[in-house]
């Protein structure tokens, strides 16, 4: 049994050094004080309960790990909480003079995370090129799905390569070849990005199975479908059935064991970080064919949305994929942000990418 003095010294060390170690993870001073206080109280409780438990160190370890991780993990539920500020450009004349401008160019679109207390406490931030290079260094990223997924891939590459870089010019051309796959290696950071044209859920399913066969898994998979199925199959219960199949394949095929990182550390949980690109709001009157207007009605959209929820593929329903809530982004950006009622301004997909990266930071237990 430890003496009272030993215990006191141990407690003092914890209160002092644990928050200092955390400060190394870029916690603000207020947070540090908060953690010091929380630890102090936890330790005081521990000391009083010690006689009832076999070992002080077990309790201390469990208390500190709970304090550290609980806070950020719950932030996954808040990461999609963003608000939009869309207003007319101050100088429409200059837009008009610029050739090839569309309606989208007449609106300035800004977005940020909601300023509620809970969301603020999560300290989400838009990542710059260097943050992303750091985070995705050496990673294999796969974006798979329909045209929405393609726009997400474009936004991610914009961020990694820089939107005015020469490289981006050729990316834009190659990525938008109709209905085809695309692959690029960003040498500077050893990141590989694959875009896989996979307009149906079955295509996504096949992709997951193929990784299993190769025994080689990407680090990040961002996928999303729905619109093709809605237009060409138009059967929400079939959509739900396909999603359940995809979900169960993801659950059974993608390994859960900790995986060694390049840096030497290991990450617990699923070794692949998985995201689902939600369906955009469809503005029926703006859809560009009669077939679309008829098949992609609000009623059908809601049936598809319900099937997505019931498929339990999303984390919020207990499934494996974290939602990038395109529905909320497109609804809040509004009709000013789309030309065809289906594909939206790049600002929407940029937001989705920043949401994904913030979730990835939390999931991989990293901070900037
Ligand atoms: C717009 O197009 C016209 C003729 O096509 C050209 O003379 C002019 O330089 C272009 N302006 C800009 C800003 O690109
Ligand atoms: C990427 O990681 C490698 C190896 O860990 C390191 O040498 C390199 O500087 C990193 N590059 C960037 C851009 O962070
Ligand atoms: C819709 O899909 C379900 C499940 O695949 C199937 O049982 C049903 O017959 C389909 N409905 C129609 C109208 O095709």
Curated annotation (Swiss-Prot):
Show the stretches that span the lipid bilayer.
Answer: 33-53
Domain of life from the UniProt record: Eukaryota
Compartment(s) where it occurs, according to its Swiss-Prot or TrEMBL record: Golgi apparatus membrane
What does the UniProt keyword field contain?
A: Glycoprotein, Golgi apparatus, Membrane, Transmembrane, Transmembrane helix
Q: Outline which residue ranges sit on the Lumenal face.
A: 54-368
Kindly list every residue the record annotates as glycosylated: 99, 137, 235
One MF term in the entry's GO annotations: acetyltransferase activity
Q: How does it sit in the membrane?
A: Single-pass membrane protein
Outcome of gene disruption: Severe growth defects and collapsed xylem. Decreased xyloglucan acetylation and decreased O-acetylation of xylan.
Q: Which GO terms describe its cellular component?
A: Golgi apparatus; Golgi lumen; Golgi membrane
Is Glycoprotein included in the keywords of this UniProt record?
yes
> Is Membrane there in the keyword field?
yes
Q: Among the record's GO biological process terms, what is one? A: xylan biosynthetic process
Q: In which broad location class does this protein mainly occur, judging by the first location in its UniProt entry?
A: Golgi
Q: Which residues lie on this side of the membrane: Cytoplasmic?
A: 1-32
The record's function comment reads:
Component of the plant cell wall polysaccharide acetylation pathway. Does not directly catalyze O-acetylation of xyloglucan but exhibits weak acetylesterase activity in vitro.
What PANTHER family does the annotation carry?
Answer: N-ACETYLNEURAMINATE 9-O-ACETYLTRANSFERASE, PROTEIN ALTERED XYLOGLUCAN 9
Name of the protein described by the UniProt record: Protein ALTERED XYLOGLUCAN 9
Species annotation: Arabidopsis thaliana (Mouse-ear cress)
Give the gene that encodes this protein.
Answer: AXY9
């Amino acid at each position: 049994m430890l003496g009272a003095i030993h215990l006191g010294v141990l407690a003092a060390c914890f209160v002092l050094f644990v928050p200092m170690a955390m400060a190394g993870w870029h916690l603000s001073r207020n947070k540090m004080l908060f953690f010091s206080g929380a630890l102090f109280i936890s330790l005081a409780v521990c000391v009083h309960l010690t006689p009832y438990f076999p070992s002080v160190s077990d309790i201390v370890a469990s208390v500190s790990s709970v304090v550290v991780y609980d806070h950020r993990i719950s932030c996954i539920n808040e990461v999609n909480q963003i608000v939009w500020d869309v207003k007319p450009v101050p100088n429409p004349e200059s837009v008009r003079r610029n050739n090839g401008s569309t309606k989208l160019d007449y609106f300035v679109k800004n977005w940020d995370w909601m300023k509620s207390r809970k969301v603020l406490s999560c300290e989400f931030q838009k990542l710059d090129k260097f943050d992303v290079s750091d985070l995705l260094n050496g990673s294999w990223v796969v974006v798979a799905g329909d045209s929405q997924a393609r726009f997400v891939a474009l936004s991610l590459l914009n961020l990694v390569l820089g939107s005015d870089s020469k490289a981006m010019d050729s990316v834009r051309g190659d990525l938008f070849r109709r209905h085809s796959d695309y692959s690029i290696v960003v040498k500077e950071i050893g990141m590989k990005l694959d875009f896989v044209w996979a307009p149906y859920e079955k295509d996504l399913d096949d992709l997951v199975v193929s990784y299993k066969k190769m025994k080689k898994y990407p680090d990040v998979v961002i996928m999303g479908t729905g619109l093709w199925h809605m237009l060409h199959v138009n059967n929400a219960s079939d959509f739900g059935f396909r999603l359940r199949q995809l979900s169960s394949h993801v659950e059974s095929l993608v390994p859960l064991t900790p995986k060694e990182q390049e840096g030497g550390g290991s990450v617990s949980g699923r070794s692949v970080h998985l995201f689902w690109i939600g369906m955009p709001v469809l503005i029926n009157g703006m859809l560009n064919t009669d077939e679309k207007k008829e098949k992609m009605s609000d009623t059908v959209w809601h049936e598809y949305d319900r099937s997505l929820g019931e498929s339990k593929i999303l984390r919020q329903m207990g499934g494996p994929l974290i939602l990038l809530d395109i529905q909320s982004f497109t609804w809040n950006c509004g009709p000013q942000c789309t030309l065809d009622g289906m594909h939206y301004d790049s600002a929407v997909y940029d937001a989705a990418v920043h949401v994904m990266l913030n979730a990835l930071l939390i999931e991989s237990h990293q901070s900037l």
